[in-house]
């Protein structure tokens, strides 16, 4: 039984789905997709549960969410195993994902009070009060790269605010989605407050088409995000929060410590096998001897990265991609770049056919032409050379995306210029592009999305503000507006 609707585990009525390990190819999970009718049932359950959940004292909702955090800690080893096996990422990285999920609970509670709690301002004749109210029924679409952590960044603040949720994990990570929801069940969520529907495109389309939804929170590709935006066009009554991808630039301007710069570039481009939306896709390196030395060392160290299974010992820096198809997509993109005139510096290769284990690739795009502005979601780093910093910033901004941007340089003035001119929601200096704080906004501009998904700023789109002017006693003002006469017995006499 792969669906959780109104507090019951039920069997999907749609197509059968089998999830295999992308490296070892053993079957991990099997179940059935939700039918459109079951998606509708999940929405009805969420709608029915909403009034009582929203009326609960915040402390009661907080207690359940904090119980969920306790269960995450108690089940960390097992959930790590599930996520690592299903995604292909190494054990060490899956463990950090669970830790991030736990840490976001406390931050989300604080964010609720700080950003969307109640604020009272005393006035001479009463008070002005700002309150926040939940939207109602929200759909949450989860991605596959962080199947626990990223949906958690929507679900936790949504529940704290008093919303009810229909959660659709990625069709590539149904096992992780189910494992997380089972912990929510143990935490004591009332029936219908959180509902799980499994499936691919058809399930997603049925969910986003529900007329009774009050909003949709999405993390995933720009293509799907654009489709959802079109589907919900003309429905301003629904909140739509999109966190999408990026074609992110990392500028390298005469680094003083070559190895430190190389380490930062590798962390930016290849962690999670390049499957983070903030990963560096474009490396802009200044022409000259320092830039040449940096590139040579980057190629040398990257060539030593050997992807391996999730439980390999010693642990690898990167594991497999989410699927063999995803690995083949990266190889296809590399070949397309070569056909357009790019020069291969380090060829990406499948470690073993039939698996998703792919070595990182580096390619010089300086002489390539007609390169599409698309996110290649995997370990492929494209290099451009530049002569002056103004040109580097222009190249960095030459994308429809605007998620992350970064600079490796000892020069603070260069970073100050980038801060003013960069078109990105995240701009880092001598820090990996993939580094982010849960207390900071996470998101970008342009094709990278609209709202800022994270434990802190997610509170903003999980509740709407209600302004009130209020006083316990109603009295006639001492000073009246012109034309108003409340003098006793001074009205018009009847004929």
UniProtKB/Swiss-Prot annotation:
EC class name: oxidoreductase
Similarity comment: Belongs to the aldehyde dehydrogenase family. AstD subfamily.
Family annotation (Pfam families): Aldedh
Entry annotated with the keyword Plastid: no
The protein's annotated pathway: Amino-acid degradation; L-arginine degradation via AST pathway; L-glutamate and succinate from L-arginine: step 4/5
PANTHER family, alphabetized: ALDEHYDE DEHYDROGENASE-RELATED
Catalytic reactions on record: N-succinyl-L-glutamate 5-semialdehyde + NAD(+) + H2O = N-succinyl-L-glutamate + NADH + 2 H(+)
Keywords carried by this UniProt record: Arginine metabolism, NAD, Oxidoreductase
Binding site for NAD(+): 220-225
Name of the featured protein: N-succinylglutamate 5-semialdehyde dehydrogenase
InterPro entries, A to Z: Ald_DH/histidinol_DH (IPR016161), Ald_DH_C (IPR016163), Ald_DH_CS_CYS (IPR016160), Ald_DH_CS_GLU (IPR029510), Ald_DH_N (IPR016162), Aldehyde_DH_dom (IPR015590), SuccinylGlu_semiald_DH_AstD (IPR017649)
Task performed by this protein: Catalyzes the NAD-dependent reduction of succinylglutamate semialdehyde into succinylglutamate.
Residues at the catalytic site: 243, 277
Lineage: superkingdom: Bacteria
A GO molecular-function annotation: succinylglutamate-semialdehyde dehydrogenase activity
EC number: 1.2.1.71
One biological process term in Gene Ontology: arginine catabolic process to glutamate
């Amino acid at each position: 039984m792969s669906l959780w609707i109104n507090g019951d585990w039920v069997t999907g009525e749609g197509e059968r789905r089998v999830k295999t390990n992308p490296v070892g190819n053993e079957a991990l999970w099997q179940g059935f997709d939700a039918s459109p009718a079951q998606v509708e049932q999940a929405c009805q359950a969420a709608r029915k549960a909403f009034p009582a959940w929203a009326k609960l004292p915040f402390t009661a909702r907080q207690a359940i969410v904090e119980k969920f955090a306790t269960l995450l800690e108690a089940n960390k080893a097992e959930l790590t195993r599930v996520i690592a096996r299903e995604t292909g990422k190494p054990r060490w990285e899956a463990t950090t994902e669970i830790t991030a999920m736990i840490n976001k609970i406390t931050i989300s509670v604080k964010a609720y009070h700080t950003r969307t709690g109640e604020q009272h301002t005393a006035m001479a004749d009463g008070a002005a009060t700002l309150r926040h109210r939940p939207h109602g029924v929200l759909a949450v679409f989860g991605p596959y790269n962080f199947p626990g952590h990223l949906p958690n960044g929507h679900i936790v603040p949504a529940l704290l605010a008093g919303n009810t949720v229909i959660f659709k994990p990625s069709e590539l990570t149904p096992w992780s989605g189910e494992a997380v929801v089972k912990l929510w069940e143990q935490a004591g969520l009332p029936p219908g407050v959180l509902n799980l529907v499994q499936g691919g495109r058809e399930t997603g389309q049925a969910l986003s088409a529900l007329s009774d939804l009050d909003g949709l929170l999405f993390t995933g590709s720009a293509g799907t995000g654009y489709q959802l935006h079109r589907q919900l066009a003309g429905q301003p009554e629904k909140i739509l929060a999109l966190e999408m991808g990026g074609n992110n630039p990392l500028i390298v301007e005469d680094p003083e410590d070559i190895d430190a710069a190389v380490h930062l570039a590798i962390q930016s481009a290849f962690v999670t096998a390049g499957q983070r939306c903030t990963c560096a896709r474009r490396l802009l390196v200044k022409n000259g001897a320092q830039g040449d030395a940096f590139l040579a060392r980057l190629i040398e160290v990257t060539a030593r990265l050997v992807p391996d299974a999730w439980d390999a010992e010693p642990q690898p820096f990167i594991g497999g991609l989410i699927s063999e198809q995803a690995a083949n997509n990266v190889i296809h993109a590399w070949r397309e770049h070569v056909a357009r005139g790019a020069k291969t510096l380090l060829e990406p290769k499948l470690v073993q056919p039939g698996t998703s284990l792919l070595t990182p690739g580096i390619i010089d795009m300086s002489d390539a032409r007609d390169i599409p502005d698309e996110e290649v979601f995997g370990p492929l780093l494209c290099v451009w050379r530049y002569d002056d910093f103004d040109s580097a910033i222009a190249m960095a901004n030459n994308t429809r995306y605007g998620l992350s941007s970064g600079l490796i340089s000892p020069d603070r003035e260069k970073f100050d210029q980038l801060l003013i001119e960069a078109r990105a929601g995240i701009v880092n200096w001598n820090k990996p592009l993939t580094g982010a704080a849960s207390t900071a906004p996470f998101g970008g501009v342009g094709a990278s999305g609209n709202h800022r998904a994270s434990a802190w700023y997610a509170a903003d789109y999980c509740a709407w503000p209600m302004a009130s002017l209020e006083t316990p006693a109603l009295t006639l003002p001492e000073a009246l507006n012109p034309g108003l006469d409340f003098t006793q017995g001074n009205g018009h006499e009847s004929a």
